Amino acid sequence: FLPLLAGLAANFLPKIFCKITRKC
């Protein structure tokens, strides 16, 4: 469960960061 969650976060967080900071 945790590795899956970590993988999901690793895939999801950069997209949020990209939207917030507008640095992609």
Curated annotation (Swiss-Prot):
Its main location: secreted. GO terms for cellular component: extracellular region. The keyword Disulfide bond applies. Disulfide bonds join 18-24. Keywords: Amphibian defense peptide, Antibiotic, Antimicrobial, Cytolysis, Disulfide bond, Hemolysis, Secreted. Expressed by the skin glands. GO terms for biological process: defense response to bacterium; killing of cells of another organism. It is found in: Secreted. Shows antibacterial activity against representative Gram-negative and Gram-positive bacterial species, and hemolytic activity. Belongs to the frog skin active peptide (FSAP) family. Brevinin subfamily. This is Brevinin-1E. It comes from Pelophylax ridibundus (Marsh frog).
